[in-house]
From Swiss-Prot:
Gene that this polypeptide is encoded by: napA
Record's keyword terms, sorted: 4Fe-4S, Electron transport, Iron, Iron-sulfur, Metal-binding, Molybdenum, Nitrate assimilation, Oxidoreductase, Periplasm, Signal, Transport
PTM text: Predicted to be exported by the Tat system. The position of the signal peptide cleavage has not been experimentally proven.
Protein's GO biological process: cellular respiration; Mo-molybdopterin cofactor biosynthetic process; nitrate assimilation
The organism of origin for this protein: Paramagnetospirillum magneticum (strain ATCC 700264 / AMB-1)
Protein name, entry field: Periplasmic nitrate reductase
Length: 827
């Protein structure tokens, strides 16, 4: 057999990745099968946005490989990516709607029984209409969506809830992972998403990882970081975390810090830069304003919680006041090397080495962060504070100098953020609270003035609280496993799902923990069973075509949303005063008003490329993906969120927005790279009215819950390489499941010895909210310091979120999954 260079690279990559995971080389590394049709696609997992080639034979995805023509992954995939072909074929795949029934009727305490789609939508419509007819009906219906939705699925859902039902109770699971990043961008720059791109990796001199285990969570990007570190003379890697993990293997400056003290470390770096007179005076004068942020903001817990008492700014956590550079200098001056070393537990020499990296004007620095920053009771603050460091030095918006927020889901950027599926957002960074933004949206959606609700809806954690309290009663969960992944499951999650006043619908391909807690389960088409689009962490939008059909009666989220809208006459959901403004809408359905509006339905099904299925086009008689995308794209064109025409994405390996005159943008806010920065402006942070970014003075504050005499250990939760999020896909891939079949509790050997425990012992882990049973691992890949334990959340047999606290960042409303107090004892 002869191998091309491409085949050789691919086979070696597969073998190396499989070997690293300790599993056998998969069949896809073997010679290709005959008669396979290959087409381009996008990986279903993390926010890196790796491109893949998808092989189809006899109506089934039989193989995938990294796309050699992709500028993101350059033909490589991580171990999860190499098994993509198996994620849709779990033995327990759902193929029919299932309703809890007893004696032939719906019963909240009944057993799941198969029903038809008509029956499913009948009872859904009944439950929704029952709530919507109440005086406060718009607050009693809600939806929890996903950063795994395709762009048009999120957009269609936003139209249905925010325009159709006039309810802003739509929030995505990206609230749990990216909301702090969004709030950080908006506060500092007035506009969302990174200014840099992955090309920064090959052009920088130093990498600093803040709360990010890229080696396991973004392994393809880590391979590029590793290559740069090993081939670029003098390149340095600094890694900061609350425990040691695989990314530490490459670290020149490894730092394990006490939870929450990253706030102090960031202020120390600013103090060092200023005290050494290293800051870029000209850049600061031209491009920066200084702000003192509000403190006493609480921890996002229920108002009755003790930590929320006497918090002066709990209602206005986002407010700030102007300050001068000298005032900022005085503010950070108290964060001395000695003080921060003692507080954080990081040796002084390492803190100083880190500060010197940032302070050296000749060293280009890329700062990467993920959940360690974002899932933080002060998550917005730490996002603001890393920008402080880069702005002081002017190390921003140019090749190799970039503060870079990495995303965890494949379209947390493209769908949750850009489309605006958060409870307060509209497309293209607009918000429901802004009169002008609502007016623009109503115009583009052809709605009567006053249709959109100006009141912010319930965010993710608040949705669970409102379900429990009986104030949110008709609830639809799509493309996410929130019962397993939301915090404080025992006290705030499960009670709301089982509240007799509520009707819970879950759309999912598999019987997840969330699905099994619902009243109605809708079987969902997956990944290559529908046409899709994702937007990755570097603003790259990528498309794929439907490759195969979904099994049985499973339907895409897009079909479900649009088909359900047919069940509502406009008179059933809108008040008379709205209808009077646009009487031609009388008698129409929400489907007619939202999706058959002359814009979404303007493209015929014949526009679909020959040889490919499109089940939604077949069902509706037009090309809904194209119509929805073009309507959505009209929000951002001319407003620094420009997307290319629909057809361009099926031809390209993704394009990074803004795309102006067919050209993508690699670096934002800097002249010569960004088309929205005019000649002579140099740098312009045009999200702010005066073009200046904000540096914030924000203090160190303790965590919402810290260890004490009884609960004497910190608990941090997260992921491992082999599994993704709740494991609903990866645990159904035999090779991945066998490699890591169960979660374990990673513990320092000394902490184990104090409790008379040995490696592999079965233990009980308890917090103030619940307990789980697991095994301890004192020799594994993750090495916590004494006083901290780490446990992944992929294992549905060990629901670690029974333990976690539902504290959130009061600004972003994102949960702090990294810090709560537990105790461990032998089971």
């Amino acid at each position: 057999m002869s191998l091309t260079r491409r085949d050789f690279i691919k086979a070696n990559a597969v073998a190396a990745t499989a070997a690293a995971a300790g599993i056998a080389t998969p069949a896809i590394a073997q010679p290709a099968k005959a008669n396979i049709r290959w087409d381009k696609g996008v990986c279903r997992f993390c926010g890196t946005g790796c491109a893949v080639l998808v092989g189809v034979q006899d109506g089934r995805v039989v193989a995938t490989q990294g796309d050699p023509d992709s500028p993101v992954n350059r033909g490589l995939n991580c171990i999860k990516g190499y098994f993509l072909s198996k994620i849709m074929y779990g033995e327990d795949r759902l193929t029919k709607p299932l309703l809890r029934m007893k004696n032939g009727k719906f019963d909240k305490n009944g057993e799941f029984q198969p029903i038809s789609w008509d029956q499913a939508f009948d009872i859904m419509a009944e439950k929704w209409k029952e709530q919507l007819k109440k005086p406060d009906g718009v607050t009693r219906v809600g939806m929890f969506g996903s950063g795994q939705w395709t762009i048009w699925e999120g957009y269609a859902a936003s139209k249905l809830f925010k325009a159709g039902f006039r309810s802003n109770n739509l929030d995505p699971n990206a609230r749990h992972c990216m909301a702090s990043a969004v709030a950080g961008f908006m506060r500092t720059f007035g506009i969302d998403e990174p200014m840099g791109c992955y090309d920064d990796i090959e052009q920088t001199d130093a990498f600093v990882l803040w709360g990010s285990n890229m080696a396991e969570m973004h392994p393809i990007l880590w391979s590029r970081v590793t290559d740069r570190r090993l081939t670029h003379e003098g390149c340095k890697v600094a890694v900061l975390s609350t425990f040691e993990h695989r990314s530490f293997e490459l670290a020149d400056i490894p730092m394990v810090f006490t939870p929450q003290t990253d706030l102090a470390i960031l202020n120390y770096i600013c103090h060092y830069i200023i005290s050494k007179n290293a800051y870029d005076k000209d850049f600061i004068e031209k491009h920066v304003n200084f702000k003192k942020g509000a403190t006493d903001i609480g921890y996002g817990l229920r108002p009755t919680h003790a930590l929320e008492k006497d918090q002066a700014n709990a209602a206005t956590p986002d407010k700030s006041d102007p300050m001068t550079f000298d005032e900022f200098k005085a503010f950070v001056a108290e964060y001395t090397l000695e003080k921060v070393a003692k507080l954080s537990g990081v040796p002084a020499d390492k803190l100083e080495a880190l500060a010197k990296l940032y302070a050296d004007p000749k060293v280009k620095v890329v700062s990467f962060w993920t959940m360690g920053f974002n899932q933080h009771a002060r998550g917005t603050w730490v996002n603001n504070m890393i920008y402080n460091v880069h702005l002081l030095m002017g190390k921003i918006s140019e090749p190799g100098n970039s503060p870079f927020s990495l995303t965890g889901q494949p379209s947390a950027c493209g769908t949750a953020r850009e489309v605006g599926t958060f409870a307060h957002r509209l497309p293209a960074d607009m918000v429901v609270m802004n009169d002008k933004h609502r007016e623009i949206t109503e115009g583009l959606w052809k709605l009567p003035p006053g249709t959109l609700n100006p009141k912010i809806g319930y965010h993710a954690v608040l949705q669970h609280r409102m379900l429990k309290d009986g104030k949110l009663n008709a609830y639809w969960v799509m493309c996410t496993n929130n019962m397993q992944t939301a915090p404080n499951m025992n006290e705030e999650g499960y009670p709301g799902y089982r509240n007799p006043a509520n009707f819970i619908v879950v759309s999912d391909p598999y019987p997840t923990v969330t699905a099994l807690a619902a009243d109605l389960i809708l079987p969902t088409a997956m990944w290559m069973e529908k046409e899709g689009a994702y937007g990755n962490a570097e603003r790259r939008t990528q498309f794929w075509r439907q490759q195969v059909k979904a099994p049985g009666e499973a339907k895409s989220d897009l079909w479900q949303i649009m088909e359900f809208s047919k069940r509502f006459k406009i008179e059933e959901v809108w008040p008379e005063e709205l209808l009077a403004k646009k009487p031609e809408l009388r008698g129409k359905t929400l489907f007619d008003v939202l999706y058959k509006n002359g814009q979404v339905d303007k493209f015929p099904a014949t526009d679909i490329q020959a040889g490919f299925e499109n089940d939604e086009a077949k069902a509706f008689g037009f090309y809904p993906q194209k119509g929805l995308f073009e309507e959505y794209a009209s929000f951002g064109r001319g407003h620094a969120h420009d997307l290319a025409p629909f057809e361009a994405y099926h031809k390209a390996r993704g394009l990074r927005w803004p795309v102006v005159d067919g050209k993508e943008t690699l670096w934002r806010f800097r002249e010569g790279y960004d088309p929205y920065v005019k000649a002579g402006e140099g740098v312009k942070f045009y999200g702010k009215p005066d073009g200046k970014a904000w540096i914030f003075a924000l203090p160190y504050q303790p965590a919402a819950e810290s260890p004490d005499k009884e609960f004497d250990l910190w608990l941090s939760t997260g992921r491992v390489l082999e599994h993704w999020h709740s494991g609903s896909m990866t645990r159904r891939v035999p090779e991945l499941h066998k490699s890591v079949p169960n979660a374990v509790l990673y513990m320092h050997p000394n902490d184990a010895a104090k409790r008379n425990l040995r490696n592999g012992d079965v233990v009980k882990v308890a917090s103030r909210r619940g307990e789980v049973t697991t095994r301890i691992d004192t020799r594994g890949r993750n090495k916590p310091p004494e006083g901290l334990v780490f446990m992944p959340f992929f294992d549905e047999s060990q629901l670690v979120n029974k333990l976690t606290l539902d504290a959130t960042c009061p600004i972003s409303k994102e949960t702090d999954y990294k810090k709560c107090a537990v105790k461990v004892s032998k089971a």
